[in-house]
């Protein structure tokens, strides 16, 4: 309920293997703008989910990129609004580690995407080597003083280095 009171155009709900009913309920109550799907959702699930959501809610499908990642994601092109590429791990959620971003230069990415996974001040220069630049960067643990607490000074430095 508190989230629904926030007047912001970038409210993102992050879900891992949740039911369609639960995602739709939370999306409506919280007045989410984006739904980020981090689990094992397939095309049938996403199609059913999109039919339950307001047309204004944008869907982001997360792909966890590792050494054996299969880039057969074309089935999702027309079902979601964005992709998000993150580092693969045994558990769901952030690891603070990067994957080899050069892999993105070897594939055609048909829709806008976000990049996540270990982005830091130390590796910011590597972002410029990606041919098809991401729409946005999902920075997190490398820019926190403790879990959930952002280091605004680091974020300001990062932002200035991106220019």
Language-model-derived ranges and their functions:
Residues 1-2, 80-83, 134-137, 163:
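Intrinsic structural disorder
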Residues 1-6, 48-49, 140-163:
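C-terminal helical cap(s) of enzyme catalytic domains, especially alpha/beta-barrels
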Residues 4-115, 119-124:
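Conserved anion-binding
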Residues 36-42, 88-94, 132-155:
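Glycine-rich phosphate-binding active-site loops on the catalytic face of alpha/beta enzymes
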């Amino acid at each position: 309920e508190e989230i629904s009171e926030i007047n912001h155009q970038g409210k993102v709900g992050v879900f891992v293997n949740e039911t369609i009913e639960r995602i739709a309920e939370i999306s409506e109550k919280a007045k989410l703008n984006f739904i980020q799907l981090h689990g094992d959702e397939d095309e049938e699930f996403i199609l059913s989910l999109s039919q339950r959501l307001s047309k204004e809610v944008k869907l982001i499908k997360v792909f966890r990129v590792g050494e054996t990642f299969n880039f057969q994601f074309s089935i999702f092109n027309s079902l979601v609004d964005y992709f998000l590429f993150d580092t693969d791990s045994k558990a769901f959620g952030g690891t603070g580690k990067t994957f080899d971003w050069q892999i993105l230069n070897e594939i055609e990415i048909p829709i806008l995407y976000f990049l996540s996974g270990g982005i830091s001040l130390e590796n910011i220069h590597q972002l410029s080597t990606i041919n098809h630049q991401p729409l946005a960067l999902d920075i997190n643990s490398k820019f926190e003083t403790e879990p959930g607490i952002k280091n605004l000074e680091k974020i300001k430095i990062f932002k200035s280095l991106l220019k």
